[in-house]
């Protein structure tokens, strides 16, 4: 599988993100997922606008890569060669050698993009054909659900609660 990391398209096992990246130490990053059906990006402009909105609301500088995002996704699409795939785009505030809530002013955002085949998901039957089993739960996360942050512990806890039935997805609501 091929991924994009900070200006390079490379094989996934060659991609290395620093353990000092603020996405690891603080969950300090945002993400967006853009699906592609029959090799066509779905609602690209709307997803890009939401990604930029999350970046602006978290004061993470908008990386120049976003100007070429469509071309980057097309190249990944070709290299990974899935007809239907989803692109996960994660942008963190970047690497900081000294752990501190205050980010250094010269921190450069880390841009990471990967994709996966929408036809096969080892965690559930094909949702494109069979549908999903879901559960509704109160949203107990922080109050800024308008920002797609990489800190998804609330979602993870909902999926792993052993006292509840197994589902494909949990829909959180306020």
Predicted features along the sequence, with ranges:
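Ordered, amphipathic secondary-structure segments that act as subunit-interaction surfaces
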Residues: 78-91, 98
């Amino acid at each position: 599988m091929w991924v994009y990391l900070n200006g390079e398209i490379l094989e996934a096992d060659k991609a290395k993100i620093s353990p000092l990246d603020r996405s690891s130490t603080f969950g300090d990053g945002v993400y967006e997922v853009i699906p592609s059906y029959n090799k066509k990006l779905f609602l690209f402009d709307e997803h890009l606008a939401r990604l930029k909105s999350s970046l602006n609301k978290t004061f993470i500088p908008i990386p120049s890569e976003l100007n070429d995002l469509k071309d980057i996704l097309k190249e990944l699409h070709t290299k990974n060669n899935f007809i239907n795939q989803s692109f996960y785009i994660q942008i963190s505030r970047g690497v900081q050698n000294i752990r501190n809530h205050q980010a250094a002013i010269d921190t450069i955002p880390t841009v990471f993009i990967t994709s996966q085949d929408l036809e096969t998901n080892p965690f559930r039957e094909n949702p494109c054909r069979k549908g999903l089993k879901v559960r509704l739960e109160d949203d107990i996360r922080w109050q800024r659900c308008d920002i797609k942050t990489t800190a998804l512990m609330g979602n993870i806890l909902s999926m792993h609660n052993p006292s509840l039935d197994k589902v494909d997805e949990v829909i959180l609501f306020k």
